[in-house]
């Protein structure tokens, strides 16, 4: 699922920069 998330991150950041911050935190927790 890491690959899928990595691919979706750019799309989310491009559409919703504000949401991108929340996603970055979620991804950081998911990786750790």
From Swiss-Prot:
The keyword Phosphoprotein does not apply. Keywords: Toxin. It comes from the Eukaryota. The keyword Aminoacyl-tRNA synthetase does not apply. GO terms for molecular function: toxin activity. InterPro entries: Amanitin/phalloidin. Probable toxin that belongs to the MSDIN-like toxin family responsible for a large number of food poisoning cases and deaths. Belongs to the MSDIN fungal toxin family. This is MSDIN-like toxin proprotein 2. The lineage of its organism: Eukaryota, Fungi, Dikarya, Basidiomycota, Agaricomycotina.
């Amino acid at each position: 699922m890491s690959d899928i998330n990595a691919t979706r991150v750019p799309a989310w950041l491009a559409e919703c920069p504000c949401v991108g911050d929340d996603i970055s935190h979620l991804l950081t927790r998911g990786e750790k």
